[in-house]
Regions:
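Conserved active-site-adjacent core of cysteine acyl-enzyme catalytic domains
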Residues: 44-130, 136-146, 152
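Active-site nucleophile-adjacent alpha helix/oxyanion-hole segment immediately C-terminal to the catalytic cysteine
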Residues: 1-50, 54-70, 178
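Low-complexity, compositionally biased segments
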Residues: 11, 23, 85, 92, ...
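Ordered hydrophobic segments in well-structured contexts
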Residues: 1-3, 123-127, 132-134, 161-167
Length: 178
């Protein structure tokens, strides 16, 4: 079972990456943000990690035993799996995300619409206000908070627009073998 943890910036300056992509990987898996950034660089070939896309952090989560599944909310607030986005190529997916910016529901509206879905232990990864955040029940963590806080905490940007939602699940041995 996945649980939210504080962001692990390590003990030295070399261990620290202050950006949100490595921070959410760290908060969910426990590795340092520097290690998360190194793994993202391995998958992307980029020299430095200062911003990430969903397709850049997904393989890192997979390497660490976490499955990132796209999800959407229908008009009634129910989560529905979004296989269409999964089938789009990377450029089309990025264009789709860029087109969605400025539209869609706010983080506060998403919280209200998903009260029932958030009552269990499901972890959600959201792209909210061009920033990665993790939510489990009424707990929230991101690179800005650094630690697990309530969704009502002042550092939580409730008016930010949600542009992407993913369900985070632990990969069991049978899924990994397939």
């Amino acid at each position: 079972m996945l649980t939210l943890n504080s962001v692990n910036h390590g003990t030295t300056k070399r261990d620290k990456n202050r950006f949100c992509g490595p921070a959410v990987i760290s908060a969910l898996t426990g590795i340092t943000t520097a290690e998360a950034a190194r793994r993202i660089r391995e998958h992307t070939g980029r020299r430095q990690i200062t911003g990430t896309w969903g397709d850049e952090i997904k393989p890192v989560f997979a390497d660490l035993g976490v499955q990132m599944t796209p999800a959407r909310i229908d008009g009634n607030g129910y989560l529905i799996s979004d296989l269409l986005i999964e089938m789009l190529d990377v450029k089309a997916q990025r264009r789709h995300q860029a087109d969605q910016r400025g539209s869609g529901m706010t983080f506060a509206a998403w919280l209200k619409a998903t009260e029932r879905e958030r009552s269990g232990n499901q972890v959600f990864l959201l792209s909210s206000g061009h920033h990665w955040v993790l939510v489990q029940r009424d707990n929230f963590v991101c690179g800005k908070t650094g630690e697990v806080v309530s969704v009502d905490h002042p550092k939580v940007k409730r008016r930010a627009r949600v542009s992407g939602i993913w369900l985070m699940n632990q990969i069991n041995d049978q899924q990994a073998a397939a």
